[in-house]
């Protein structure tokens, strides 16, 4: 079964490349990345683009994993597909992001200048050391992150019916942006199975891949019995 993976703000498909080998043979990891996201005025426009690009690929059995910004994108994509009557993911793994009825984790991003935002990303573990060492790469990463976080701010939280597919919310025990109680708020967004998985670490707890896979693999193994 395919696992479509949606990266964090400022991230890209490379985040999930190591997952391919780790989750074989039962799961095909498909990283999702939309280039030039600055061309989208709102998150709704980005969701439209992702839905159009993935439409044929999502006809078969599939799952979503989204981290931070990617969790919101994955959730809104599932909502869009529910409205149009398209197949939903067999399950969704939503990581390090609060549901849309709560404030976005970095809703005050425009109160931070580029240096402050870069420092915050580094402190959170979201900026690799090889990028920090190169000012041009660092500046590009900060700019892309700001674009994605601004898209989060455009999310239109209309009344949304609970989705008919399981949701498993993941988070770090020491995440300064998203609390365990925030993650439990996803319960209202599904009419099916729900769980919260708290792993050791901060906002980027998933950098500890052995720990993540030890928790994720048993959940993946049960997805075949789920029906959405």
Positions of predicted regions on the chain:
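Conserved alpha/beta-hydrolase "acid-adjacent" motif
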Residues: 176-182
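Active-site nucleophile loop of the alpha/beta-hydrolase fold
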Residues: 34, 79, 90-103, 124-125
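Post-His helix in hydrolase/transferase enzymes
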Residues: 206-222
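Gly/Ala-rich beta-loop-alpha elbow adjacent to hydrolase catalytic centers
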Residues: 66-70, 74
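Active-site nucleophile elbow and catalytic-triad environment of alpha/beta-hydrolase enzymes
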Residues: 142-160
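Short beta-strand/loop motif that positions the catalytic acidic residue
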Residues: 169-171, 175
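Catalytic histidine neighborhood in serine/cysteine hydrolases
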Residues: 188-204
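Active-site catalytic motif of lipid deacylating hydrolases and related acyltransferases
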Residues: 1-61, 100-117, 199-204, 223
